[in-house]
Amino acid sequence: MIKIRLSRGGTKKRPVYKVVIADSRRARDGRFIEKVGFFNPLLPKDKKERVGLEAERIKYWLGQGAQPTTRVARILGENGIIAMPANGSNPSKAIPKKERKKEGDEAAPAAAPKAEAAPAAEAPKEEAPKAEAAPAAEAPKEEAPKAEAAPAAEAPKEEAPKAEAAPAAEAPKEEAK
């Protein structure tokens, strides 16, 4: 997979990054396909020299399927090359760990009834698309019977071993007495 990412340069404690197009399997500072910009985090945000990007080349690579890393996506969003990515803030991370665990324990029992209600609500939704798909499947008559017969044949096979396993489990208990 092709990535648009930062490649670190500079000396100790003085980072300077190149914005590069690279294969995701390569090392962070390893071989890259093309350099499309630079980023100097030591400069103030309002300085023009902080970020330099080749917008046309970046748009080309995005069109080719290159995926920007989260940091590069923010830089590209701030410079108007792509839409600004959603803010990945996690407000629960600011709460001390002990308090989060207490809240998690209290929330878990409340979530259980909701989880049970959700599958029941989804079941009618699943049946409706199948009913709509059936008339469309009747047009090609040869394919529809094969498709309908296969799921029907699989269902009894799955139920039969369960039914056989239960009597087998009860039989050894009776013999032991």
Swiss-Prot record:
Residues 80-177 are annotated as: Disordered. Keywords: Ribonucleoprotein, Ribosomal protein. It holds the Pfam family Ribosomal_S16. One of its GO terms (cellular component) is small ribosomal subunit. InterPro entries: Ribosomal_bS16, Ribosomal_bS16_dom_sf. GO terms for biological process: translation. The keyword Ribonucleoprotein applies. Residues 107-122 have a biased composition (Low complexity). One of its GO terms (molecular function) is structural constituent of ribosome. NCBIfam families: S16. HAMAP family: Ribosomal_bS16. Belongs to the bacterial ribosomal protein bS16 family. This is Small ribosomal subunit protein bS16. It comes from Pelagibacter ubique (strain HTCC1062). The lineage of its organism: Bacteria, Pseudomonadati, Pseudomonadota, Alphaproteobacteria, Candidatus Pelagibacterales.
